[in-house]
């Protein structure tokens, strides 16, 4: 009994000694909020520069997939070119100009041109042409164009590998992102990302020139390794260096600039792809256009190298550092203690990825093409909307808590997947093609609105706020690993699954797309229910250790001293 009383006395002493410090900390935070500098200060601008360059490189790498795949499809589709010189200069296909005695000359393939071999002259003949087309392994039926076509571009498995290769690299890179950023610091992390990005971009150019798919995949994997690092390093740097009053607002900018990078890729695709004159009698230089798309990847990588040279090192250090910098103890919390929050990080990652955003981002040209728009025009519309809607997250981050905005976005995007993009698109639900396409396109735009205003920007802030300051690099790294696992599953499986559910390449692709979005919506609703009950940002008073030995000669960095509460 006496031992127990003695322990209680010691505990009460330690608490009483600590409470004045906490009161002082809260007072300091209040003073910091009242005396906060304007938003546009030199220090905040430096932090925003990190978000701008890191986010833009990340976004362009994401948006690169759909545009490059579409341009590559043009470079392998002989049927698109209507004049002899443009036909014979197609870079990645063995196209031949056929001269017909009747005057209907055309560009086709030496072995078989499916649209000519299985042509039909009346609607009554279409079922027979479809059956003969499907019986020929060299051809596939297009339900949107209602004709037999030669396969062009990447197959569904190649598309999945192309989209998933960078994500596989990001998955591996994010495993080491937290420890790496803590050990070598932010500046060296950015420098390494930029240098590796330049190497990967050179591989893009080489792959384009030689039409070597494996070189492209290796380049994507390599840049993914260090994009996994930057997706952790940029939010952590912002959390540690932005002024507490503006930390949340600057934090959402990583997603804003990610969407800007995606938009730049879409804009380049529109400029390079829509300017191809298929009916012009001359070389359309499709390969040069593909090379032009790769140039911006090189540019953003070089800017990241410059960022690593000119940016300041983080104010927070782990286990030592320069005098005057806040010190964090990485051993304060272990993975076992953080299991509940790590699991909630996985659920957040599920909301981010398993509701289908990357299916929309990577396959927007294909999806919008199947809904009646020109692929690159549809892609541009989607990505422009994607960027514009993200801007609304900046003022919202200062008015509402990150948790509330994230939860609203979770339920909203899930409902859009189910009731706008999924069920109405399923064959037989809508008898009018225009109505089906109109509802689906509206659903995709509303889905992007909810994701980019609410889910995406808040996610990167919550990956910090979910964990205590000393655990944030490791916690954010773990959450990013989960996010990239889900991302990889979606990118690789989406094209393969939709094609298989549709009944193969010649099946009605609307069926597979509808089932996929119904699946996304269902998973999103499950994640939403879990998050309503268990998603709560870290609160030092509520969640922190109640008994902590005072550190001698060290500056403790608590939640109150590095940022305002998110809830």
Swiss-Prot record:
Localization: Membrane
Membrane-topology descriptor: Multi-pass membrane protein
Any GO molecular function: carbohydrate transmembrane transporter activity
Ranges of Basic and acidic residues composition bias in the record: 1-30
Chain segments annotated as transmembrane: 47-67, 161-181, 190-210, 213-233, 250-270, 290-310, 342-362, 367-387, 405-425, 438-458, 481-501, 515-535
Coiled-coil residues: none
Main location: membrane
Keywords: Membrane, Sugar transport, Transmembrane, Transmembrane helix, Transport
NCBIfam families the UniProt entry points to: SP (TIGR00879)
Functional note: Probable membrane transport protein.
Family under the similarity heading: Belongs to the major facilitator superfamily. Sugar transporter (TC 2.A.1.1) family.
Protein name as it appears in the record: Probable transport protein
């Amino acid at each position: 009994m006496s031992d127990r009383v003695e322990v209680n006395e010691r505990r009460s002493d330690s608490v009483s000694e600590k409470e004045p410090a906490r009161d002082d900390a809260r007072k300091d935070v209040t003073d910091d909020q009242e005396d906060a500098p304007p938003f546009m200060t030199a220090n905040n601008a430096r932090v925003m520069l990190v978000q701008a360059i890191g986010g833009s490189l990340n976004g362009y790498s994401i948006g690169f997939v759909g545009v490059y795949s579409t341009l590559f499809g043009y470079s392998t589709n002989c049927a698109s070119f209507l004049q002899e010189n443009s036909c014979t200069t197609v870079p990645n296909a063995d196209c031949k100009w056929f001269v017909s005695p009747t005057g209907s000359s055309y560009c086709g393939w030496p072995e078989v041109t499916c649209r000519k071999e299985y042509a039909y002259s009346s609607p009554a003949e279409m079922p027979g042409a479809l059956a003969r087309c499907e019986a020929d392994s060299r051809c596939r039926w297009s339900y949107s164009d209602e004709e037999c076509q030669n396969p062009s571009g990447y197959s569904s498995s190649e598309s999945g590998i192309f989209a998933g290769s960078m994500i596989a690299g990001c998955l591996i890179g994010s495993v080491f992102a937290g420890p790496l950023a803590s050990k070598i610091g932010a500046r060296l992390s950015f420098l390494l990302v930029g240098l590796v990005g330049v190497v990967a971009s050179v591989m893009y150019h080489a792959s384009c020139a030689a039409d070597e798919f494996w070189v492209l995949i290796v380049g994507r994997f390599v840049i993914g390794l260090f994009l996994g690092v930057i997706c952790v390093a940029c939010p952590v740097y912002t959390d540690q260096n932005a002024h507490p009053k503006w930390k949340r607002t600057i934090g959402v900018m990583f997603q804003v600039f990610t969407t800007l990078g995606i938009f730049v890729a879409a804009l380049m695709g529109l400029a390079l792809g829509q300017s191809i004159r298929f009916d012009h009698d001359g070389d359309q230089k499709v390969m040069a256009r593909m090379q032009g798309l790769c140039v911006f990847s090189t540019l953003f990588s070089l800017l990241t190298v410059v960022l690593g040279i000119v940016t300041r090192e983080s104010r927070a250090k782990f286990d030592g550092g320069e005098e005057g910098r806040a010190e964090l103890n990485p051993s304060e919390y272990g993975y076992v203690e953080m299991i509940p929050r790590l699991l909630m990080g996985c659920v957040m990652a599920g909301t981010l990825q398993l509701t289908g955003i990357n299916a929309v981002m990577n396959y927007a040209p294909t999806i919008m093409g199947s809904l009646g728009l020109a692929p690159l025009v549809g892609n541009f519309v989607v990505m422009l909307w994607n960027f514009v809607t993200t801007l609304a997250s900046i003022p919202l981050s200062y008015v509402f808590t990150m948790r509330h905005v994230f939860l609203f976005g979770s339920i909203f995007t899930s409902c859009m997947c189910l009731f706008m993009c999924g069920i109405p698109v399923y064959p037989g639900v809508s008898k009018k093609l225009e109505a089906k396409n109109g509802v689906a396109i509206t659903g995709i735009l509303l889905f992007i609105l909810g994701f980019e205003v609410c889910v995406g920007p808040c996610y990167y802030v919550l990956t910090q706020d979910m964990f205590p300051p000393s655990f944030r690099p490791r916690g954010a790294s773990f959450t990013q690993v989960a996010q990239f696992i889900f991302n990889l599953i979606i990118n690789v499986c989406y094209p393969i699954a939709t094609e298989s559910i549709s009944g193969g390449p010649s099946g009605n692709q609307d069926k597979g797309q509808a089932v996929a979005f119904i699946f996304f919506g269902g998973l999103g609703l499950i994640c939403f229910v879990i998050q309503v009950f268990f998603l709560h940002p870290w609160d030092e008073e509520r969640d922190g250790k109640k008994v902590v030995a005072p550190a001698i000669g060290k500056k403790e960095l608590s939640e109150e001293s590095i940022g305002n509460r998110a809830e």
